[in-house]
UniProtKB/Swiss-Prot annotation:
Organism, as annotated: Clostridium pasteurianum
Main localisation: cytoplasm
Localization: Cytoplasm
Protein name according to UniProt: Elongation factor G
Family stated for the protein in its record: Belongs to the GTP-binding elongation factor family. EF-G/EF-2 subfamily.
GO cellular component annotations of the record: cytoplasm
Superkingdom of the organism of origin: Bacteria
Electron transport as UniProt keyword: no
Keyword Transferase annotated: no
Function: Catalyzes the GTP-dependent ribosomal translocation step during translation elongation. During this step, the ribosome changes from the pre-translocational (PRE) to the post-translocational (POST) state as the newly formed A-site-bound peptidyl-tRNA and P-site-bound deacylated tRNA move to the P and E sites, respectively. Catalyzes the coordinated movement of the two tRNA molecules, the mRNA and conformational changes in the ribosome.
Keywords in alphabetical order: Cytoplasm, Elongation factor, GTP-binding, Nucleotide-binding, Protein biosynthesis
GO molecular function, one term: translation elongation factor activity
Lineage: Bacteria, Bacillati, Bacillota, Clostridia, Eubacteriales
Amino acid sequence: KYPLEKFQNIG
């Protein structure tokens, strides 16, 4: 998906 997927996983 995207590099921030691990951080965006909050949503």
